Structures are given as C-alpha cells and as structure tokens.
C-alpha cells in the first residue's frame, strides 16, 4: 500500500497548546491566557497553557521527536502576541522572531518542510479588547500581521495556513461562547465572525499574491474543520436533505466563497433569511458580501486544507419554536451511531474521511488537498502501549490509500494531531492526542514515544502501510 512518491507525512502542534512561556521575553497576553486565568471551570480543572509542554524552552526536545518519526513536514503555529505583543506592528518582539527563526532553520537543516499557521485560536488580547472578530477593524490588523510574517519568514516558509479552523473559531468563540472571550451570541456572533474571518483570509492571500509570491513562490490557504455528516436514515429524503444542509452550513459556508465564487451557499442564505424573518429581524442575521468583496474573496486558496477526526449522523429537526442558533438555522440534529467506539467526542469512523475527501474533490474542482489535522485521543492517564489507538490511524491510512487510488483524490500531505500531548482547549490536559507522551507533573516535561509513534515512523519509512487493502 505505497502512497504516491513525495507524499508528505507530518505531525502538527499549535503555539498556545505546546509553547508555555506565556509571558516570557516580552510576549503579550493572548485571549487564552486571559480566559484560563479567569477560572470558572470553563477549562478542565481550571488548567492553563502557562507552561504546557514547555516548547518555548524545549524546542530541541521537540526536534528530536520530529527526527525520531522521520517526518517530511512539520506543522506549527506562530503566536501572534509573541511576535507582536499588542497585535500591531507598532512594537515587534525580536525574541519571538528569534524563537521561530530557530524552529524554521532547524527544520530545514534536517530536511523537514515547515507548514506554518499564522493564527491558531490565540488572538492577542489587545485586539479582542477592540472587538476581536466581531469588529471589521480586525481585517486590517490580521492583514498587517500576515504581511509581517510573510516578509520575516517567507524566504524559508513556502506553505502557509492563515487561519486555523475558521469555522470552529467563529462558532465556539462568538456563537456558543465556549472559547474566549466566552460571551455567547446565539445565531448572530458566529456569522459576524465568519464574515470577518473570510475577508481577513482573502485580504492576506491577496497581500501574499501581490507582494511576496513572485519572489517567495509559496502557497497560502486556510484550514477548515470537517466532520463527515451522513443521513441517519439513508432512505429518508428529509434526512438526506438535512445531511446536505449540515455539510453546507458546516464546511461550505467557508469553502464556497473562497474556492468557488466569493459568496455563501444559497441554502445557507435562504435558511437564515427565512428564520430571521420569522424571528422579527429587519434583515437576515447573515451579513452580505458586496459585489466587490465577492470578487476579492473568490479563488483565495492555493490548496484545500481540511481537518478530519470523526463522523456524525444527521436528521431533520424542524425549528418550530424559532430558536436562535446555527443548528436551528440549518434545522438539523446530529448524533453518533451507538455501535461506534469512541473516546470523548471522537467516534472511530474511518470510512468518513474517504467520503469527505471525495466530497471535496467533487465539490471544489479536484483541488490539491492537505489533511492538516487528524488524530485520536487517549484519556489521562494514558498507557504508552496505545495499540488500540494505533488501529484508528491504521484504518485511516487504509481509507486515505483508497481515496488516492480508487477515487483519484489529489491528497498530498497528511498531518497527525499531535506531535505531543498538549493543552486541548476546554479539555485541558485530560485528553492526550500526542504521538509522544508528555509528563505534565515533571518540570522537565519529558517526551516519551507511544507505540503509535513507533508505528507511524514505520509508515513514513515505507511511505505507506505494509499490508494490502
């Protein structure tokens, strides 16, 4: 089961989740610093990323893990407030530049291609104080930050992700309020944030295109989270339509403007407009793009970056009471099949990734696809022999192989989440996704490979699984 020659095998991390050094060497506070320091049990046991894996001082240890796996690519994110403490280029923190220069240079010296995310949920607190992603002013702030990163690191970094999981960020931070700033705006905030995230991404892509691409010759995209959504009853027309609506609200709301035509899907526009009208709003709760904005947004990604973990079943759920919320706008409910095995929210459904990749190929004109995250957690305490977890990866690789060989999907890179056990947002350190175990009780934060790491290293060496289909 050999993968195509030159296939990229990677692992991923994100700044707030691994670095620690939350106020070291001039770093400014980010929204997760503020959110976790406020307590209130919004994060498991009020844990914080103040130290996390200590990667800010232990990069050499991370590099050893990367080399041990034999990764061809490594995906990590830049901390916006480590580079620009107040989020603007008014003050630039040289120590932050030095840290990321060392990571990039060490990777390249070791034949590893960096995939760099500009922004992975950790907005500078100074910008959140000015309205964050609910304010249109953020578009220019993000563009200036992106240009700063392109000009500082782009001579060596050729693969960029502007915004990590924009579709998760908009809902979790500004609709449900489960991520910072922690204030829910049901049925309104998520759409407002999405609108600004899409425009900020597009602006920064154009900046790269016009100012840096000719010289640097890199690629820029954003990453989107996608659960595969299957009709609960495949024979029910209403469930089939609900599943289509679900994927449209979940993925296409972001992907269609960027990859196809600069505008939201029709079903999203009509559902939200109709619900808004019933609820007495003077206009739709979904903002509209101007014709000029549509032109600016269309075609602003050089590859399709998607993050897949699991699958859900979908059925039609009429919004009789006119409740506010994204699920209510889509008129769906989702749930797992009771026969699926799971840890936390991740149910083992390997065939979902193949269906998702085929959907992206068919809907988005057969783009180059990177899976920028995929993984399976263990609950804490986690055994080092994680043979069961490796089974999730093994079955996933079988499905990726089928997608490439049988469906002719143009998948070029796979990133396992994560290189290290780390701070998993609201779950704190209770959910361990690492290929390497990290002892969070030990100040030295030793990294020890799980069985999965050893097995993944074999896959990378062989460029695929040894077994047949």
UniProtKB/Swiss-Prot annotation:
GO terms for molecular function: beta-galactosidase activity; beta-glucosidase activity; galactosylceramidase activity; glucosylceramidase activity; glycosylceramidase activity. PROSITE patterns: GLYCOSYL_HYDROL_F1_2 (PS00653). The N-terminus is blocked. One of its GO terms (cellular component) is cytosol. The active site is at residues 165, 373. Pfam families: Glyco_hydro_1 (PF00232). Keywords: Cytoplasm, Glycosidase, Hydrolase, Lipid metabolism. Its EC number is 3.2.1.21, 3.2.1.46, 3.2.1.45. GO terms for biological process: beta-glucoside catabolic process; carbohydrate metabolic process; galactosylceramide catabolic process; glucosylceramide catabolic process. The keyword ATP-binding does not apply. It is found in: Cytoplasm, Cytosol. It catalyses: Hydrolysis of terminal, non-reducing beta-D-glucosyl residues with release of beta-D-glucose; a beta-D-glucosyl-(1<->1')-N-acylsphing-4-enine + H2O = an N-acylsphing-4-enine + D-glucose; a beta-D-galactosyl-(1<->1')-N-acylsphing-4-enine + H2O = an N-acylsphing-4-enine + D-galactose; beta-D-glucosyl-(1<->1)-sphing-4-enine + H2O = sphing-4-enine + D-glucose. It is an enzyme of class 3 (hydrolase). The keyword Cytoplasm applies. Substrate binds at residues 17, 120, 164, 309, 417, 424-425. Its main location: cytoplasm. Neutral cytosolic beta-glycosidase with a broad substrate specificity that could play a role in the catabolism of glycosylceramides. Has a significant glucosylceramidase activity in vitro. However, that activity is relatively low and its significance in vivo is not clear. Hydrolyzes galactosylceramides/GalCers, glucosylsphingosines/GlcSphs and galactosylsphingosines/GalSphs. However, the in vivo relevance of these activities is unclear. Belongs to the glycosyl hydrolase 1 family. Klotho subfamily. This is Cytosolic beta-glucosidase. It comes from Pongo abelii.
């Amino acid at each position: 089961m050999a993968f195509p020659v030159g296939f990229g095998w990677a692992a991923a991390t994100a700044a707030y989740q691994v670095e620690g050094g939350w106020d070291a060497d001039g770093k400014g506070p980010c929204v997760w610093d503020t959110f976790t320091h406020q307590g209130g049990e919004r994060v498991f046991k009020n844990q914080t990323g103040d130290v996390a894996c200590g990667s800010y001082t232990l990069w050499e240890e991370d590099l050893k893990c990367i080399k041990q796996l034999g990764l061809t690519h490594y995906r990590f994110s830049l901390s916006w407030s480590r580079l620009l403490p107040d989020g603007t280029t008014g003050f630039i923190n040289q120590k932050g530049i030095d840290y990321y220069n060392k990571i990039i240079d060490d990777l390249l010296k070791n034949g590893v291609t960096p995939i760099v995310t500009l922004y992975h949920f950790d907005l500078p607190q100074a910008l959140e104080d000015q309205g964050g992603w609910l304010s249109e002013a953020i578009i220019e702030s993000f563009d200036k930050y992106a240009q700063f990163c392109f000009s500082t690191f782009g001579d060596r970094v050729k693969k960029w992700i502007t915004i990590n999981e924009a579709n998760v960020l908009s809902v979790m931070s500004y609709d449900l309020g489960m991520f910072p700033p922690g204030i829910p705006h049901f049925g309104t905030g998520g759409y407002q944030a999405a609108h600004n995230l899409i425009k900020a991404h597009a602006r920064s892509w154009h900046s790269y295109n016009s100012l840096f691409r000719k010289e640097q010759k890199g690629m820029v995209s954003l990453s989107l989270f996608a659960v595969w959504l299957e009709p609960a009853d495949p024979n029910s027309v209403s469930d089939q339509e609900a599943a289509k609506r679900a994927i449209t609200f979940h993925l296409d709301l972001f992907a269609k403007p960027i990859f196809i035509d600069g505008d939201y899907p029709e079903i999203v526009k009509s559902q939200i407009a109709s619900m808004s009208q019933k609820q007495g709003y003077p206009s739709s709760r979904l903002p509209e793009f101007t014709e000029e904005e549509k032109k600016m947004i269309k075609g602003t990604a050089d590859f399709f970056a998607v993050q897949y973990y699991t699958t859900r079943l979908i059925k039609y759920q009429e919004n009789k009471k006119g409740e506010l919320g994204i699920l209510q706008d889509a008129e769906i409910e989702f749930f797992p099949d009771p026969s699926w095995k799971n840890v936390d929210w991740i149910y083992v459904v390997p065939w979902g990734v193949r269906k998702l990749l085929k959907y992206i190929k068919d809907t988005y004109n057969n783009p180059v696809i990177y899976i920028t995250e995929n993984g399976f957690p263990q609950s804490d305490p986690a055994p080092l022999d994680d043979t069961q977890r490796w089974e999730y990866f093994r079955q996933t690789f079988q499905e990726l192989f089928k997608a490439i060989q049988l469906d002719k999907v143009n998948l070029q890179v796979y990133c396992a989440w994560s290189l290290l056990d780390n701070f998993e947002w609201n779950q704190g350190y209770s959910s361990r996704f690492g290929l390497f175990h990290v002892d969070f009780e030990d100040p030295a934060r030793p990294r020890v490979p799980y069985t999965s790491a050893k097995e993944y290293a074999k896959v990378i060496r062989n460029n695929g699984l040894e077994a047949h289909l």
